[in-house]
Design a protein with these regions (language model features):
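Phosphate-group recognition and catalysis centered on beta-loop-alpha active-site segments
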Residues: 19-268
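Bacterial Sec-dependent N-terminal signal peptides
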Residues: 1-22
Length: 268
């Protein structure tokens, strides 16, 4: 009888510990690129691998070519591997960029192609990180093009936006459909200012949140979503859960899922 009581007590204790934390959502940074069959951030296979995990979202970077085409690519210099040619996305034509392979042999995707794939598994949102451009005019062009492509694909309710440059954030707030999720991706503005910008979320590096932990409660009081990136270490994932972070963006979504389940029960 005593053994049964202790077993029940142990189960109750585990449940109590798990129940005290709210489960954060998980976003795969650049897709699940560490999956054996993907291996490249922003590749189509990385998006597919993230969708198979049934997590909240898969992040990808969107950039504007010299001739105004929106491509899914991480930065100015395409990460094609040392043996492959490099090109500045913003100073190159779409044709040139689309001919450069990723290190895993895949090629860059257009935003249209990514949205087609996202539509097949709408439970996993596509998180679009609009990259800063050389001029404000190009940033406005990028915002306009992205919003038009998303609208044409009928994916407004399945897409969220990240903006590292304030101008991109202001343009998104002004032009995106009402109710769109728009995060300021930076580290310099406090929650009050970000709320004033019209954004719905702060997407800051884990180091910023640890340094300014009071911003988490402040953001929540203002109705803002708190997102931390790039959270890869087990201790950092646990810290985010313990401190009420709403979204964890990570290169290690499988590890994050495991820890969320352990500390919070089944992810919502």
């Amino acid at each position: 009888m005593k053994k049964i009581f202790l077993a029940v007590l142990a189960v109750a204790t585990v449940f109590t510990v798990s129940a005290q934390y709210k489960a954060p959502q998980i976003v795969a940074n650049g897709g699940y690129h560490k999956h054996a069959s993907s291996g490249a951030k922003n590749s189509m296979s990385a998006l597919k691998a993230a969708q198979k995990l049934k997590i909240y979202g898969s992040e990808c970077d969107v950039n504007l070519t010299k001739d105004g085409k929106v491509l899914v690519v991480q930065s100015g210099w395409h990460p094609g591997g040392k043996a492959n040619p490099k090109a500045d996305v913003q100073r190159s034509s779409a044709k040139k960029m689309l001919d450069i392979p990723f290190a895993n042999g895949e090629y860059i995707s257009t935003l249209e192609d990514f949205l087609k794939r996202a539509a097949k598994k709408p439970a996993t949102k596509l998180i679009l990180d609009l990259k800063s451009q050389a001029t404000l005019q190009r940033e406005t062009k990028l915002v306009d093009e992205v919003l038009a492509i998303v609208e044409k694909a009928g994916m407004q309710s399945n897409v969220e936006y990240l903006a590292a440059h304030p101008w991109v954030a202001f343009e998104l707030v002004k032009k995106a459909p009402q109710g769109s999720a728009i995060a300021y991706l930076g580290n310099d503005y406090d929650p009050v200012y970000v709320k004033g910008m019209g954004c719905t979320s702060l997407d800051y590096n884990i180091k910023v949140w640890k340094k300014k932990k009071n911003w988490i409660k402040q953001a929540h009081k203002l109705g803002l979503v708190v997102n931390a990136w790039v959270v890869n270490k087990e201790e950092d994932i646990r810290w985010c859960i313990q401190n009420g972070v709403d979204i964890i963006t990570t290169d290690e979504p499988v590890l994050a899922k495991k820890i969320v389940k352990e500390m919070c029960g089944k992810q919502k």
